[in-house]
């Protein structure tokens, strides 16, 4: 199979990359791909954490993180919220960390207006749920009862939207059936979807309980797709393939930093610990994404929907050994029938379980790990009661993921040393930090 310059409709136009010489445009990318749309981006890791923008060759801005390499002069930093010039990068760091991400609706991913019927949700989904219950409305999905519910598509399938409301934990007992405004009923925090008179029984699987709230949050926080957009005017070669992958990885890194800020508990860690975790686990997160996208393919790796590598392309790019290692992970997760809920939770666990030696507050990081482990266990207990060991089996895949990540980092670091492939500041800096 040759490189696929697949058709991408106009809805994807906001994700089209720019040339490697203009990394400042990653600001647009992170605003699109970060779930809350509030994360900033730049050409280097420390400036990405702080909302600064640097050129491709600008030095790192965070002086207290020597593992990033080079302190460099303090540059003038423009605050996004005013026209004043901020001279101190540490001040900007604190500003960005204090800009907590907004709470998201667990049903569609829009900005939540508060907790409605037991769940963080937006006004639109609150009103939809209330109308459905009060009107005793039955819906039927025209497809397979698996429609994706997002802010943009939440009106496309009422049946799947209502099922999503129940799945994330909205409580039908909280809706007043008499349509009278006033005090709220007291109700138990549970869902008995199988007994609901408002659902077609064929649409519901009665044995399953609602998702763990952390898992639901991670599903909503999952970023939009990023496209590789390989240059169709350049002939296929190892340099073209590696340049495409390095550019893609750089843009994915920006998105990962924005995504991490939406993991419950991550933004409460110190800046130094956030940096340490990301510097340690970023490649594991990237590889896990490739693995998940590749589950429905045979012996091919889906680096992006428009960039799929088979064995011949892997050989051409000099990536055969690395890609074979990643395919072993694909095979393992495919045999386990990895679900999206497990994928997003494993990504967060991989970040929290990093092997960094530079953690300041070990107790806080341990607490984050415990919360995420419990979320996975709770999900498996509710969705896979037939396999009580499934959570443990999932966690046992992480050592192989880390081993594969180490191989990938070393391979791309060697490419960096050769100097034949252009790399953005952020990707280059993260390779340095990991090695």
Curated annotation (Swiss-Prot):
Low complexity bias locations: 34-47
Any one Gene Ontology molecular-function term assigned to this protein's record: nuclear steroid receptor activity
DNA-binding region: 102-177
Record carries keyword GTP-binding: no
SMART domains, A to Z: HOLI, ZnF_C4
Residue spans of biased composition, Polar residues class: 10-29
UniProt keyword list: Acetylation, Activator, DNA-binding, Metal-binding, Nucleus, Receptor, Transcription, Transcription regulation, Zinc, Zinc-finger
Functional description taken from the UniProt entry: Orphan receptor that acts as a transcription activator in the absence of bound ligand. Binds specifically to an estrogen response element and activates reporter genes controlled by estrogen response elements. Induces the expression of PERM1 in the skeletal muscle.
Other remarks in the entry: No physiological activating ligand is known for this orphan receptor, but 4-hydroxytamoxifen and diethylstilbestrol act as inverse agonists and deactivate ESRRG.
Family: Belongs to the nuclear hormone receptor family. NR3 subfamily.
Name by which UniProt lists this protein: Estrogen-related receptor gamma
Organism the protein comes from: Pongo abelii (Sumatran orangutan)
Record lineage: Eukaryota, Metazoa, Chordata, Craniata, Vertebrata
